[in-house]
Every structure is written in structure tokens, then in C-alpha cells.
Amino acid sequence: MSLCTVEINLSTIKNNYLLLQDVCKTSLVGAAVKANGYGLGAIQISKALIEENCRHFFVASSEEGVNLRNALGLDINILVLNGVFEHDALELIEYNLTPVLNNLKQIEIWQKFSNLKNRLLPCYLHFNTGINRLGLSSDEIEQLINDRDLLKGLDLQYIISHLAISEEIDNPYNLEQLNRFKAYLQYFPNVKASLANSGGIFLGQDYHFDLARPGAALYGLNPLTKNPVTLKAPIIHLQNLTLDSHIGYNMTFTTKRDSVIATLPLGYADGFSRNFSNQGEVFINSRSVPIVGRVSMDLINIDVTDLPPSEIFLGQEAEIIGNYCTPNKIASIIGTIGYEVLTNLGSRYKRKYIG
């Protein structure tokens, strides 16, 4: 078992959810738990959020949906964002998973299985309003408006769309997408709607509709919510190096003084990016400690020379992620986003759930 521990505070995630619910007022709030709950544990997080009356959980694939259904039972809604395909349609039906249909081909597939089972099948429709990833195009939406038989056999529960730049509150593209979405919804007056992701929740009530779908904000990746994640690693080796000693592969760091160097048992095999080589930091007792040398597969080195001697010992824990080094702060060092930091948390880490 790994010597490193990821601690996930479920109470913090629940409090983040309640904050979002308070902002959304009368709209329902679901939860994006795709990619194993952004690397933190979809099942554990979903069970915690069910305690706060969350009933809509969004996953990426049928496989993720099946795993969640097996763990949570039948009384919640599990939505599959990537939609339905010929190979997994029967699995979606068997496990009561609701696909988000992204194009006319997926609608056709779901209709086919509706006819096969001789019953209505639930679905969401995804309208592309400008992010241009998934979603029915304007031409496809027009076909649906003009020919309602295209939805025959389907229990259309929600129409959704996704915002491209919701984290920029003043970006006019948000309003463009909102207006496109509203224009489409006029043709489906009795269908519930969902637009707001985490950032969209804070754009105002016009974006909330019937259901919000936060992911990042639940996991502390929004400035108004709290980080629930701590990653700690113990010092497993200490050495005293003289001036001009080289550290790590390819000798990319050379000591500029006599130095005390500590080694921690994590590396790029654990999702700790090589881009942190010679520029990342960890914290020991609230003090910043620089990463020196290359990040290797299983190990990193840190320079603890400036710490008090009483704080330098084998087994001393360094905080890799936590209150001093949040996922967003870490991500900014290497030009990525907090989402990537969390979803890259390695499977070798021991997971500990509190709260």
C-alpha cells in the first residue's frame, strides 16, 4: 500500500453542495460525479450527497453509470452524458440509466430500443448552444421542432445545454448561449431545462432553470467553495549534500550551498506531473519547501535546508495538496487547471474519507 494518503472531507463537499443549493434557491441541484467523482470517489461522494437530498448524478459513460447504480440502488437519477450507443443501449435499460442524447443518431438508437421493449424510454436532450463539443446542432434541433415524431417513444425529461466560458462572469458569450437556449426552449414549453454548470450557478438566476449541474464547485475548484482534499506524503529519506551536488535524473538541479534534501514517495506514476520538476512546492508545518530535481516515477526530492532541525525527520509529513496548496494553486504553477490535478490523483494513493 502507498505511503501517501489522499484525505477527502465529505462534510466539506456536502457544505459546498448546500451553498450551491442556497444560491440556486428553488432550482434543483444535481452533481457531476464523472471520472470517479473527479478522482475523489464517485460512490462515496454520491452517498454523502444523497444525505443532502441530491437525486441527480451525472456520469460520462454507461460503465460509470452501472458502477454507481450497483452501489446506490434504484431511487436516484443517473444521467449518462455521452449518450447511448448500439453496444450499450440494453445495459442502460437494464440499469435504469438515462442517456443524454447528443445527436439524431442517438435519438434513432434510443427509439429503436423503445420499439423493441414496447415502452417509453427516458432521455435528456443536449442542445449545442455554442461550446461545440457534444449536442444537437441547430439544423438537428430544427428537424425536431418540425417533426415531433422523431421523439416518438421517448420520455423527454429535460433539455440541457453546456456553457463554454461560465467562469468569466462578464463574458458576453454566456448571454449569447443563454439566449439561444431560451429561443430553443420556446418550442418545448412543457419540458424541464438545465444549463448551469458550476460557473453558471454564479451567473444569476436566469441561468438556473429547473436543474443545475455542478461538478468543479463541489470539489473546491470554484473560488466560493472550499477545498475538500488533502494529499500528504512522509519523508522516507534524508541526506546532507555539499555545495555543487547534483540531484535527480539528468542533473537538472545543482545545490548552491550545503543542503538538506528529503525524498518523498510519489512521482509521475501517481499523477504528479513531471512539469513540477524544479518549480513545484510542498508544505511542512505551513512552510513552503521547494521541489528540486526531476520528478521521477515514484519519487520527488525537496530542499528542507531552511526548516528548523526539529521539523526534519523520517516520517515527517509534507502536504502536497491542502489548504496551503489547493488544486487550483498547484495547477497554476504548471499551466493547467485544478480539474486535471484532481483527476490525475493516482490509484496507488490510500484514500481516507472523513466527515
From Swiss-Prot:
One of its GO terms (molecular function) is pyridoxal phosphate binding. The active site is at K34 (proton acceptor), Y249 (proton acceptor). Disulfide bonds: none annotated. It comes from the Bacteria. The modification N6-(pyridoxal phosphate)lysine is found at K34. It catalyses: L-alanine = D-alanine. InterPro entries: Ala_racemase, Ala_racemase/Decarboxylase_C, Ala_racemase_C, Ala_racemase_N, Ala_racemase_pyridoxalP-BS, PLP-binding_barrel. Pfam families: Ala_racemase_C, Ala_racemase_N. Substrate binds at R133, M297. GO terms for biological process: D-alanine biosynthetic process. Pathway: Amino-acid biosynthesis; D-alanine biosynthesis; D-alanine from L-alanine: step 1/1. One of its GO terms (cellular component) is cytosol. SMART domains: Ala_racemase_C (SM01005). Keywords: Isomerase, Pyridoxal phosphate. Transmembrane segments: none annotated. Its cofactor is pyridoxal 5'-phosphate. Its EC number is 5.1.1.1. Belongs to the alanine racemase family. Catalyzes the interconversion of L-alanine and D-alanine. May also act on other amino acids. This is Alanine racemase. The lineage of its organism: Bacteria, Pseudomonadati, Pseudomonadota, Alphaproteobacteria, Rickettsiales.
